[in-house]
Regions:
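ATP/NTP phosphate-donor binding region
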Residues: 1-92
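Fold-independent oxyanion-binding glycine-rich loops
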Residues: 22-23, 43-45, 96-98, 141-144, ...
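Glycine/serine-rich anion-binding loops at beta->alpha junctions
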Residues: 90-108, 143-149
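N-terminal loops that bind phosphate or other acidic moieties
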Residues: 87, 108, 126
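Hydrophobic/aromatic beta-strand patches that form the interior of the parallel beta-sheet core
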Residues: 65, 94, 137-141
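Short, hinge-like loop/turn segments at secondary-structure boundaries
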Residues: 58-59, 82-85, 111-113, 155-158
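A glycine/threonine-rich phosphate-anchoring loop and its flanking beta-alpha core
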Residues: 113-170
Length: 170
């Protein structure tokens, strides 16, 4: 008779709130309005897919600026997205798309409040500095399944200069 494996203790830190189900994107405007008034919406390579989200944000009084992520996030792309968020005076970041859009959103939310460069906070090839301030609020709306980016604090970012990817924990 097989003996059950002993329980291995662990701790799981997840998102504060998960809203799940068909059509829940229709709640995004009201949810966003409770967190901020000026959102940077980070999308995948086809920003028109976010049109329903943008309609709900407008209806809820949230001013949105769209930043499209054409592929996997890189250090340069994160810098550009953070600059767009600052120029828009964003107080909320919304990721809408696959893992690349969601990872970009999380990294931008951390950079806007902490300042500096993505390399300051990157593991492996970065300076590994801790983030000292809380990130801007983030709403993650996955449109694909697979990465689980919506339930982690990690943002995986590539650096062509280093020939590698590393995490930035928001």
């Amino acid at each position: 008779m097989n003996q059950p494996s002993p329980a291995i203790p662990f701790e799981l830190a997840g998102p504060r709130r998960v809203v799940f189900g068909p059509g829940t994107v229709h709640q995004a405007g009201a949810l966003a309005a409770g967190l901020g008034r000026r959102a940077l919406v980070v999308t995948g390579g086809n920003p028109s897919r976010a049109s329903v989200l943008l309609e709900h944000l407008r209806a809820a009084g949230v001013e949105a600026k769209v930043f499209a992520v054409p592929g996997e996030p890189t250090i340069e792309l994160i810098r550009a997205a953070a600059a767009a968020a600052k120029a828009h005076s964003s107080d909320l970041i919304i990721g809408f798309g696959g893992g690349s859009a969601l990872d970009t959103a999380k990294a931008v939310a951390a950079l806007v409040t902490n300042g500096g460069d993505p390399l300051d906070y990157m593991e492996s090839f970065g300076r590994r500095q801790p983030l000292m301030r809380s990130s801007l609020p983030v709403i993650a709306i996955p449109t694909t399944a697979g990465t689980g980016s919506e339930v982690t604090r990690n943002a995986v970012i590539g650096s062509p200069e280093h020939g590698a990817k590393a995490s930035m924990r928001s």
